[in-house]
Each structure stands twice: as structure tokens, then as C-alpha cells.
Amino acid sequence: MLLWLTNFLSQHFHAFRVFNYLTFRSIVSALTALILVLSLSPRLIKYLVSLQVGQMVRNDGPQTHLKKSGTPTMGGVLIIVAIVISVLLWGDLSNRFIWVILLVTVAFSAIGWMDDYRKIIRKNSKGLSARSKYLLQSIIGALAAVYLYFSATTGAETALVIPFLKNVLPNLGLFYIVLAYFVIVGSSNAVNLTDGLDGLALMPTVMIGAALGVFAYTTGNHFFAQYLAIPYIPGAGEVVVFCSALVGAGLGFLWYNTYPAQVFMGDVGSLGLGAALGVTAVVVRQELVYFLMGGIFVAETLSVILQVGYFKLSGGKRIFRMAPLHHHFELKGWPEPKVIVRFWIITFILVLCGLATLKLR
């Protein structure tokens, strides 16, 4: 939004030309989101407390979680709002990728909000039914995948980038839609499953969001794309503004969400942020690298699938003490902060491995 104004002003005042630089707009996008979340979170926490919007804790979970009961939740609304405001202010609103990512993020957050609202405000412990939630996610994910496929202007936009291999870009054809759908929907639910401890999902989301921003910048820059032997996608660089806003908003919220958390982001935050990472990975053609960098999300999801499947097949036996995986380690005696920080460290290592694929080809 401000880009249009600064473009006009730069014709008369040279100082405004700095706003034309993607790197500058990305930095101020992150700072805008960070300041918004840091400054508004205390008021939001007080407001949520006054509404008695408190987290409900499972009785069959780790006993250390019982003290979390009543902690304000649904704070993820502020993360999403800060991201949207920041991107609308500093992003190029003529860029189709920006709009797809924004709309998917907001739509999945709306699903999370409906689920939180039913569970916490309406006191319906089940929230949205699994079928209703998955149906809504599927519709949005499929629409985004179909749009990205049919709006593609180059073959690179629908090709599969295989890590560590140079100039190997198999065109997916219609299978692109299937892959994009599963990445978006799967990512949303994986982050949601991981969001069970204070800051556990948020810091990995921030780290992966920053890494995807690097991929977006290099993919959208003809010189760097050619130098690194990765596909060049015109317009993908603008996604850095979104990734920067996500990083800023995430870090701002983590100030209050870190152990012991003063507020939780709820499904409204985790579903939206997970979808944001998924659709961003699709846009910059890094689905496989995202699978690597999001190894914690993958492990958490697989632990649930394996636990449920084995429980049904074995007649009541379990692989893990409890799923998702972070609860298994808690029940083994790991203090919550140790689980959180170790998962962060693993994600940091995986993100570095993901970034290394830019050069190791």
C-alpha cells in the first residue's frame, strides 16, 4: 500500500527511493510486525483474561500441564493481524503470490478461530468436528493449489526442485495440484499438533519462515537464481516481505509465549502459521527442503499417526507413552523447557541443512 505512495514521492524526492528496495521493505515489514505484537500483547492478554478465554488442559496428559489451565489463549489472532497489516503496508499489492499467501493464512486462521471459539467460548470441548475442519482446510488448500497451477507463467513454477541435484527439474503437471494441496493442509495440521508446549511450535516456525524468506529472495532474483542453479520465478522475491512479517510477529509473540507462557496462540495461530509456511514453500518450489527443515513437525505428525494406527492394530498397545512426540519425552521425565529447547536446536540444525542445499548441488 505504501509502495504506491513512495513510488510517486520518489519521482520528486530521491530519499523515498529507498522504499523501492526489497531488502529495506522486508526489514521494516519485520519491525512493523514485531512492534505491533510487542506493544499490543499486554492489552490483548488482559482482554482475554477479562473474557475468561482460558486454555483447557487434558486430564490424561502430563500432570505438569494442569497449572496451565486458564492461561489466556487465542492470542494467535494478534500474530495474524500484525502479519496482514505489515504486508499490506510494505508489500507490492500487485503481486499475486502475496495475495495467495495472505488469503490462505487468513482463511486457515479463520478455521482455527472457529475451533477455538467453540471449545473455549461456547465450552464445547470437541470444537469443530474433525470432518468439518478437514473439509474446510481441503477446500481452501485445493483452491490455492489450483490457482497457483493455472496462474503459472513459467514451467519452473510447476516443476519439482530436488535438493542437491543441479538442473533436475521434473515438471509435475497436474500432480503439482496434489502436492501443493498436501503440503498446505499437512503443514497446517503439523504445526497445530506441535503447538503443545510453550513456544515449541512458534520458534521453529520463525526459523523456517526466515529460511523460506532466503529461498524466496534467491528464487525471485535472476542473478542469484542463475548463480545457484535454482529455478527463477518472477515475483517470488516479494514473498520475502511476508516472511519477514511472519518472523517479526512470531518473535514478538514469543516474548509472551515462552516458558512459562503468559498467553497461547491457539488454533487460530497454529493453523494459520502452518498453512503460511506450507503455501510459501510451494510458491518458492521448496517442498522437499521444507520437509527437511520442518523435521520436528514431521516427527510430531508421524508420532500421532503411528500411535493411533498401532493402537488399533494391536488392540490397545502403544508405541509412545503419549502422542504427539513432545508429550512422550515429558512423561519420560524431561522438564518442559528441556524438551522445548532441544526441539528448537534440532530445528536450527535442520534449517541450516536446508539452507545448505542452495549451494550444495
UniProtKB/Swiss-Prot annotation:
It comes from the Bacteria. One of its GO terms (biological process) is cell division. Pathway: Cell wall biogenesis; peptidoglycan biosynthesis. The keyword Iron-sulfur does not apply. Its EC number is 2.7.8.13. The chain crosses the membrane at residues 18-38, 73-93, 97-117, 135-155, 168-188, 196-216, 235-255, 263-283, 288-308, 338-358. Disulfide bonds: none annotated. InterPro entries: Glycosyl_transferase_4, PNAcMuramoyl-5peptid_Trfase, PNAcMuramoyl-5peptid_Trfase_CS. It is a multi-pass membrane protein. Pfam families: Glycos_transf_4, MraY_sig1. Keywords: Cell cycle, Cell division, Cell inner membrane, Cell membrane, Cell shape, Cell wall biogenesis/degradation, Magnesium, Membrane, Metal-binding, Peptidoglycan synthesis, Transferase, Transmembrane, Transmembrane helix. The keyword Transferase applies. It catalyses: UDP-N-acetyl-alpha-D-muramoyl-L-alanyl-gamma-D-glutamyl-meso-2,6-diaminopimeloyl-D-alanyl-D-alanine + di-trans,octa-cis-undecaprenyl phosphate = di-trans,octa-cis-undecaprenyl diphospho-N-acetyl-alpha-D-muramoyl-L-alanyl-D-glutamyl-meso-2,6-diaminopimeloyl-D-alanyl-D-alanine + UMP. GO terms for molecular function: metal ion binding; phospho-N-acetylmuramoyl-pentapeptide-transferase activity; UDP-N-acetylmuramoyl-L-alanyl-D-glutamyl-meso-2,6-diaminopimelyl-D-alanyl-D-alanine:undecaprenyl-phosphate transferase activity. Its cofactor is Mg(2+). One of its GO terms (cellular component) is plasma membrane. It is found in: Cell inner membrane. Catalyzes the initial step of the lipid cycle reactions in the biosynthesis of the cell wall peptidoglycan: transfers peptidoglycan precursor phospho-MurNAc-pentapeptide from UDP-MurNAc-pentapeptide onto the lipid carrier undecaprenyl phosphate, yielding undecaprenyl-pyrophosphoryl-MurNAc-pentapeptide, known as lipid I. Belongs to the glycosyltransferase 4 family. MraY subfamily. This is Phospho-N-acetylmuramoyl-pentapeptide-transferase.
